[in-house]
Amino acid sequence: AVYLNLCTFFESGHFPDHTSNIYDMFSSAMIAPLSDAQQEFLTVMGLADEFTVEMALFITGNQEAGQILSLMTRQNAFITPLPDGVSFRFHHMMKECTQRAFAMLSHEKQADFRNRYGQWYESQGQFLQALSAYNKALNYDAALAVIQKDAGILLASLSPEKVLAFLDACPTEILKNRPLALLVLMRRMFTWHQIPKMLELKQLLTDTIAEDNTLSEDERKNLSGECDLIMSFLMYNDITGMSVLHRQASSKMTRPAISIRKTGSWTFGSPSVLMMFHRRSGTLDAELTAMNECMPHYYRITQGHGQGAELLMNAEAAFMQGNFSDAQILLEQTYSTIASNGQHNISLCCDFLAARLSLFQEGVTFVKNPEVKRKELLSLHNMMWMNIFDSTYAYYYALIRMPEKIPALFKDHMLSTVSFLSPCRPMMEMIENQVFLSQKMYAKVIGRSETLLPVCEKMHYELVSLHVQIQTAAAYAMLGKHHDARQLLQKALGHAMPDGFLIPFVENYTYIKDVLSSINSITP
């Protein structure tokens, strides 16, 4: 600010008064004296948060971009080299001024540069940045191509409102020209609980399959089969019902699904497979059998997406029943099955089980110091993986009563700031309940559970509901309301015993032991 004031004084003979615009002062002092080529360089590259010389060459189309950047970095403290030795960043004041200058360019020039940004980010696999650039350039076809490439993986981190706004703006004919992108969007609409929009997109896809004469018969069948695969999610957590459509899809398809990537999320962000698919009390054995029979059909058309899920579900079931050695063997089999096949989601779910199992069984592989793994996950740029990782350590540290070590997302109760996919939110809320218990915020647990239990019932989340009932009973017990605690525990026992579930009671035993001992019978 002092420098800008002095510049104004030397130019005009007086210091600026309180009505002066700081951005105008900055532009006059730092940008206006530069050559046209330098000004254009700043104007265009000001859209980037960070950039390299290679990126600047591509975006500006100026072969002297490297020399310009080198000169300006030496002469201008408002362009900063970053510690990696190859990237640069504008000072926020410079960035604001150059973005204002960019807004003064013609619409054609703006669109041209934004398309270049889109092409650059797309080539680097930075699909969200590419999508944003193409969207601002109104290049809907290129944006849909990016959505298809991403297969909904990074798209999941956007708010539903942003994607719905994009769909409202995108012409129908352009949507119909990208049937594979429609499939990706259908699946994402399901995870955001936007079912009417999902069905609307399905109709567009059906029309395309019927009307597009350029499609071969094989591709029509592949698209129809992949549509069956996506529509199976409407029967989510009914394993047998989903598998009917998986087998139907498998009979039509001659290629793997394109709208579901092998490396993408399988659990929608849930840290547990069993919590997703245990639907009714007393049906555990049938659910495990169905999962074992159904998953091979799904793997065939998705190149092994979610591979190991059925093994992990069996491991979790054994753990829940207190069969720790069986659980450990199945867990190690799952780790071995998914080794080096890119199934980060299932691996993180294995870690969730390992964390809990390590409290009961010796020799369980569980990383007590999570910082190295956190850095590895951050390099993948996938917030869903980070959220599963945080949920594991939140639950673990809540169980061992070390709330100070719980990751900030859960410790500071910031779940409302995260755009979780709807199938995983009840699990995250249940884990936050356990955190509240460890923080002795018992009334909070009771108040939240009144809202969470009906959601679990509606989604057929029997196991999540069981956890929440026990947590609520624990909170009542800690507040001295033993009658309320006893009623909830008796109800929970009635739900748990047909499947032999013990561990949710054991994990909360410190809170409920006095009330539990007062219950005469634990048979349902």
Segment roles from a protein language model:
Residues A1-N21, D36-E40, G46-E50, G61-N62:
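Amphipathic alpha-helical "lid/sensor" segments that cap RecA-like P-loop NTPase cores
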Residues S28, A32, A48, V53-E96, ...:
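C-terminal leucine-rich, beta-strand-based interaction scaffolds used for sensing/assembly
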Residues V44, D112, L180, E219-N222, ...:
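Residue register of alpha-helical TPR repeats
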Residues R74, L131, A151-G152, L167-T172, ...:
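Amphipathic alpha-helical segments of tetratricopeptide repeats
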Residues R100-A181, L185-R188, K197, L201-L204:
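Extended alpha-helical scaffolding segments used for macromolecular assembly and cargo binding
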Residues E108-A111, Q124, G152-A165, H193-E211, ...:
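Helix-turn-helix repeat elements of alpha-solenoid scaffolds
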Residues I174-C350:
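Internal alpha-solenoid helical repeat scaffolds
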Residues M427, Q434, A443-G447, T451-P524:
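C-terminal non-catalytic interaction modules
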